[in-house]
Every structure is written in structure tokens, then in C-alpha cells.
């Protein structure tokens, strides 16, 4: 689970690549104002999940909903992309604003809201095929129709065969995902209502999840250089094949992990989706589902310092020969989970004169049984690195005899365990009130009873850590072996709390074209079960998380431009983050739990422009300053040296201060269009203390879509048009490097994640 920050800027991003956008289903669009189409599937980091719309804070986890319910309750263990894809089983998608999401779900975030294809009286089929020049093939099929006058059916199949942009020698595919949907719908009372029973089966294996790192040479000016013989995005920084010895956190036994294992996910889900329009104008919706994922597993790779060693340092290759050259201390986490949830949401709504009222209820139950084991190893710095062995004394060995080993530091870095459940019972409402033709008020509130009961191991982690009663051993200065007793057991933590959310939005038209808008939203929550998988917050650290969002600005609209400009403030208190801190210049790391605040002040201007016939442009500019507050940590390493990190008032890592988006689209003919998407991400800091950074970069997309006739559509698109070879995210092992030390790292070998390489994709769609 390893709680790593994924950060988001505050701009709502409107996209225009038509091939990726879906319309709302008719029964939903009848009850909503028409919204801009927004492409959330163009993701420069991962082809298999939606991009994360940015609001200036770490992710609040689930941001995709299906038929009004979370696609996965929590993606901390059971990953979203393992159970949901934007496929032919969907009738359409929409985008919930932070205000809407806060009231309906308790999370302040832009969220994708998707709706299932339920069918219609006549038979229809959709077959989509996609491929790229690396060998990826994707087949997506939906069949739907009617049975008699009052029954509908739908069936879908999604198959993804993605080898990635480089060959993983230990497996054929970086992502192999299968999704199957079946559903039947009963039409009620001449179309006034419907009841649908839907089944979904997912089976996903995604070893590409841990193959997204690359070594590079860091230049002090924010740029990187390629290492000879290694092309980021085109070469693998994962071994060809092999197995590793590790210490199982739960059993305390040494076991073997084969690289082809550990990324398996499969789940079964059954859902009841219904709605009914009463004669008095009230619309009632009732949606519920049960999902069980007996395997929700994934693997994480991490890095540390890259250094040069000589033969005298004792590293050996698998054939027993001595090694000299560059090595990196690598880290691996094996995550094993079982997840189930039972979710229910019901809403009633009605237009009452100039009020549009909605009242809803959530009853969401989630059960988690999860643990992870970690180990460390040393590898060569090259494509398909070779694993190196070294002399190692296992702290669980009472003889304290050194043996040659490829793995070490078992469970020293953030092994996790928790088992338990959480439940949310919430009542919420919204009202859209048209006070006058010029003045509109939207407001809402949410009150949520939250109960969590989880097993927690609060004991600090150490080399040889596992559950149970046992001894670890160390050699004293006089040569004697000293034993230390351990009794590691989980203790139950139960919490009963009230969370709340509220929102108020005011819109006033000064003229027919120009107006003012302002809104304020607040949401609160307490630490979740996933945050107890590590050492977790103590009673003193257990505090309410509060997220206020305040925005205000202007809007202007005429025949050719729709423009808005807003100033935004958002903050989050008591954010919980588990950090692995590496001692600079070494491979040694320690895990600490951090609780801190973040606040962001920014300005965003967005425009939809239609300057001439057949041409549309979306443009966006954001300037923001996200900073840490109360961010302090210290750690003591094995040699007794204590080091600290103080990131107070420093820019949050990975968040750019400048964002630009340019998305032109031109209709060449009625059935042929060309589109581009350019996104600029300004300078981002790659560590906690503003010492290392990456220069700004462009993420670029483009394509042509051709509707050949009513039955056939074709498309071609390009990702990373200019084949930019940049790094992004953080730099491994750099957490404790300060500004004063930054100059020493000019020209140093480091590692981190990278942009998706130049990719050409082809698509075809058939309707029948």
C-alpha cells in the first residue's frame, strides 16, 4: 500500500479528443444541465486508467464511480485499473465537480462518473479494436437488445494484450486484463422505471506496474542525460527473469517470489441498478452492489542511491565472478490482499418550482485483509540489470554467520498488515435554486457516520520483522551473540466518528454575457483503514482531516468564446504519509510516518474558443503555489547518525506551479476531424526540500478520426509527438538531500520514473 503522495493541481481540464469522449445516457442527461465534454482518458503516465484531474492536493483515493457507486471502494490495495476500464460496457461518462463529489461521496475531487450500457429494444452491437506499434492489441465488444416488450439485455467483453514499450523477459505482457459484463433489465410500467441486474468478472495481471523506473544522469540545471546503453521508456530496468528469497511478514518463513507472480487480481461483482419516475414528479434511484476480490495483489519496486563499487567491495554476479561498476540498491514490496465490499446508494429528486432538490443516502461497507513483505537487493545499472550477491548476516540467524545472499534487509522498509472493515452511513442533500433569471444558488450538505475496526501493528519496523514471538540476534563488541526478544502482534483499533461536508455556490449574471461566481466547499474525514496498515497514527496523532475549498472569479460568454477566470484556495490538514528516507550516498533507508498539512493558492483561466466554423480550441492557464505546512521528520541510521527533513513552506514535490493546456480540434469534413492536445507542466521539485528538480516539459497527443459511414469509424493517434525523453515524479533516494548539498549531485547517476515514449495507436470501431 505504501502511502505515496500523488499530487494534483487545481484546474478543471476540458479536453476535445472526440474519439475518447462518451455522451451521457438519455435517462441521465434529461436530469442534468449539459456539461462540457471532458476527455479524462488521455493519460501520459498510464494507458489503462483515467488521468487524474488536479486540484492541488494529494489524491483522496477513488475518483471513478460506476452507476453512482465507487468502481472500487479503495484503490490502495485493489487497483482501479484491475477492475474498471473505459470500455464498450459503458453508455457514457460524466465528470463530477469537487462540490458535487464532496456531497455525494465525501471526497473533494474531480471524479469520473460512468454509466452502464443497459440495452434497448432493437439489437445493437459495438466492436472496438485498438493496436499500437509496440504490439499492443485491445478488443472491446458489446451486444445489447430487447427480449419481448419489457426486457433488455447487455453483454460485454474487454481483452487487453499490452506488452508495453519494451520486452519484459519474464512475461509476455505488461498488462493482461480481461473484463466480462452481463446484464438483464426489466422495464416497469410502460417505461416509467427499470430494474437491472448486472454481473461483472475481472481478471487482471499488471507486472508493468513495477517496471516504470529508469536510471539517468541528473544535471544540476533540472535536465537529465541518458546513460550509455539505456533509453528510458524503451529499455527495461527490471531483470530478465529470476526469483528472490524474502521473509513473509505473516508467517515468519523464508519464501520464494518468482517475478512472473504477485500481480494477480480477479474479482466478481453483482449489481442491482434501478430507477422509477413517479406520477407526482419524484424520481427515485436505487443502486447496490456486492464485490468480492479474493486476489488483489501487486508488486512495487523502489530505488535508492546509485554508486560505483570495485571488486574489493565483494559484489558477485550469478556465475561467481567479482563485479565492479555502477550499482543501485533496489527495494521490492510484495502486496497480498483480499477485498470485499457491499455498497448501496439511493436518491430521490424533483423539480419544485425554481428548486431542483435531491436527497440521498449511502450505506457503504468495506472489508480488507492485507499484508505486504519487503526486501532489498543490489543490481547493476543497465538494461535488464543483473542481481548481485553480497555477504549478509541475517538477524534471525542465531549463529550470526555471514552467507552470500542476493536479498537482504527483510521487512526493514515499511512492511504492512491490517485486517478489518470500515462502514460509511451518510445522509445528504443538494438544492439548485434559481432565485431569479440572473441569480442561481447551489447548496448542499452531508452528514456521515463512520465506523472503522482494524488490526494494527504499531511496532516500528526493523530488519527481520515479522508477526509472532521470536528472537533477533546481533554480535556485540566482544564478539558474543546477543538475543533480543520480540512479540509482534496486531491489536484492534475501533473508531466511531461523524464526518460532514457542505457546499455553497453563487452565480450571478451581471449581463447576458458576463457574470460573477463564487463557491465554498468543506469536507472532513478521519484516518481510513488503509492508513493503519503501516505503524498507523497513534491516539495522539489521530485527528480529523479537514479540506476547505474556496473559489471566486468571473465568467464571460459570447458567440465564439466561453471564458472563466478564478482564484482558488484549498488546503488539507493532518495528511498521513509513510516515507522511506534514504541516507544520502548510501542504500540504507528507514521508514517514518509523517502527519502534515498542505495548502495551495492559485489562479486559473480557462476558455472554450470557436473563432471560425469547424474549429474549436480549449485553452487553460494555471499558476499555483502548493506548500507543505508542519512537515518535519527525523530518523536515526544504523551508524547512530540522526538526520532530519524540514519541508515547511516548501513547494510540494511533483506539483508544477505553472500549467498550460492547448487543445485544438478541426472538423475537416462532417465525418473527418483532426485534434491535438498539448499540456505544459512547469518546473517540479523531485525531492522534499527543493534541492533537486526537473525542468518543465510538454506532454503531447494528436490524432485523426474518420467516421467512414454509419457503421465504421477509423482513427490514428500519436502519444508524445516530439518523443520527449524526460523524467518525472521523484528521484529515488533523494528525500534527505538539502539545497546546500544539491550542487554535489550535478552529473550523478540517479533513477526515477519517465514519460511514455513516442507511440502510434490505431483504432477501428464497428457498429451493427
Question: Which stretches of residues belong to each language-model region?
Answer:
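Transmembrane beta-barrel wall of Gram-negative outer-membrane proteins
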Residues: 124, 131-162, 166-237, 262, ...
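Face-selective signature of the C-terminal outer-membrane beta-barrel domain
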Residues: 265-294, 324-464, 507-509, 519, ...
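Structural signature of Gram-negative outer-membrane beta-barrels, strongest in the C-terminal barrel
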Residues: 339, 358, 362-364, 412, ...
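Conserved C-terminal beta-signal and adjacent last beta-strands/turns
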Residues: 8, 144, 337, 543, ...
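Repeated loop/turn-to-beta-strand initiation elements of outer-membrane beta-barrel proteins
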Residues: 124, 150-153, 190-197, 281-284, ...
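Acidic, small-polar-rich N-terminal luminal/periplasmic segments of exported/outer-membrane proteins
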Residues: 22-122
